[in-house]
Regions:
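Bacterial N-terminal signal peptides that target proteins for export
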Residues: 1-11
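N-terminal signal peptide c-region/cleavage motif recognized by signal peptidases
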Residues: 17-21
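N-terminal periplasmic/intermembrane-space "pro-region" immediately following the signal or transit peptide
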Residues: 23-122
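Short loop/turn motifs that connect adjacent beta-strands in outer-membrane beta-barrel proteins
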Residues: 29, 52-56, 75-80, 92-103, ...
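Outer-membrane beta-barrel domain signature
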Residues: 52-53, 117-123, 151-155, 192-195, ...
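Transmembrane beta-strand segments that form the barrel wall of outer-membrane beta-barrel proteins
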Residues: 104-121, 142-153, 175-183, 187-191, ...
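Well-ordered mid-protein domain cores that form the structural environment of catalytic cofactors
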Residues: 124-221
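Signature for the C-terminal beta-barrel architecture of outer-membrane proteins
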Residues: 203-371
């Protein structure tokens, strides 16, 4: 099936109209919401938001808690300065989410060609897409049933359930099952860990609901922290069919201006690969490199990457500026990641006219071990 360019443009226009009139409610700011991220990062750089912003999605509850904590710790004039266009945008977006707690959303889109580059912003990558979603959200739970159809050349899976999830809050932890986009890292154009460049992986997850600082005097230096653990099922159309994706990410905020993230991802098991408890334990402890672990050929339990990233937020001359980097090791040496790929960038917020703009310069080196 092939659609004409004129029909695709008509569908895209219809999609814009429908999306403008119906905003689905979610308990978090989704990976791909570029405008919301712009305002969130600006508030964090200005000292108007406590918490971490290196793992997406981010819950609305955590954002508003971090905003209130920042205001409470500031002098009256500084707190007044934080009530700006960035906080106003988030307040308006949160109110729209609350008012649309239950409903349905229809999204249509299309593209005449795949984009040359992808980024944090959500974008259509197939010739024609359509999705209908039924959603509902309560105080401690949220659910979304999304059924989509895609006509394109990226893969042969036309019927999809991407963006479907069921999540709930237990204590200060969020438990969920489903397939949602994730973005792990500080980059605007790319991420060396998880990103929305690929389709979301269906699976289970657990993450902190409120990334508050530890109360212990021994650990308070960590500052606000977040932990996310995921376990997903990959598809069969790959070198090792039906492998599992396991991942963990820890982000902490030791200084108001500095965030540090630690990430580990592993492809484990799958057809023709060991996937018993011994193989799982070998993957956990990093004994999965056949050249150094003593395992025989074909017994490597997993394929892993691990690394760190950071974001340093500054305000020279009251201009929000961010310096960030990400380093992911493709191999292991001495129990630590090695053969790194890297990403580095600089971003700045400007205030031309009545709005705000963000300019960034970002470079990525994806050749492992190039430095």
């Amino acid at each position: 099936m092939r659609l004409s360019p004129s029909l695709i443009r008509w569908l895209g226009a219809l999609c814009i109209g429908l999306s403008a009139s119906s905003q689905a409610a979610t308990p978090w700011v989704q990976a791909g919401d570029l405008t919301a991220r712009h305002h969130i990062e600006a508030l964090q750089s200005q000292g108007c938001l406590k918490g971490v912003t290196l793992s997406w999605p981010i819950s609305w509850a955590a954002l508003m808690k971090g905003y209130r904590l920042a205001l409470a710790q500031q002098a009256p004039d500084q707190a007044s300065a934080c009530k700006n266009q960035h906080s106003a945008y988030l307040q308006k977006a949160l109110e729209a989410t609350r008012q649309a707690a239950t409903g349905a959303q229809l999204t249509l889109g299309g593209a005449t060609q795949e984009p040359l580059y992808t980024s944090f912003s959500s974008q259509v990558e197939d010739e024609a897409t359509g999705q209908i979603a039924l959603y509902s959200m309560g105080e401690h739970w949220a659910a979304n049933l999304a059924v989509g159809y895609v006509d394109g050349e990226r893969d042969d899976t036309h019927l999809r359930f991407d963006d479907t999830y069921l999540a709930g809050i237990v204590g200060n932890w969020q438990l969920g099952v489903g397939a949602i986009d994730r973005w792990w890292g500080p980059g605007w154009q790319s991420s060396l860990a998880l990103s929305n460049n690929a389709r979301p992986v269906p699976g289970l997850w657990i993450s902190r609901h409120m990334p508050l600082a530890p109360e212990s005097p021994w650990l308070s230096w960590i500052g606000p922290w977040d932990l996310q653990v995921i376990a997903g099922q990959l598809e069969k159309d790959r070198a090792v069919p039906k492998a599992r994706l396991l991942g963990a990410r820890f982000v902490f905020n030791p200084l108001d201006s500095l965030q540090i993230g630690l990430t580990r991802l592993a492809q484990w098991g799958g057809e023709g690969r060991p996937q018993d408890l011994d193989a799982f334990w070998n993957a956990v402890i990093g004994r999965d490199n056949g050249q150094t672990s003593g395992l025989k050929e074909g017994q490597d339990p997993s394929n892993q990457i691990a690394g760190l990233d950071f974001r340093l937020s500054l305000t020279p001359g009251d201009v929000p500026v961010g310096l960030y980097g990400q380093f992911m090791g493709e191999d292991e040496a001495g129990g630590m990641p090695s053969k790194f790929s890297s990403l580095a960038g600089l971003d700045m917020v400007t205030g031309l006219g009545q709005g705000s703009q963000r300019v960034f310069l970002e470079a990525t080196e994806t050749v492992a071990g190039s430095w």
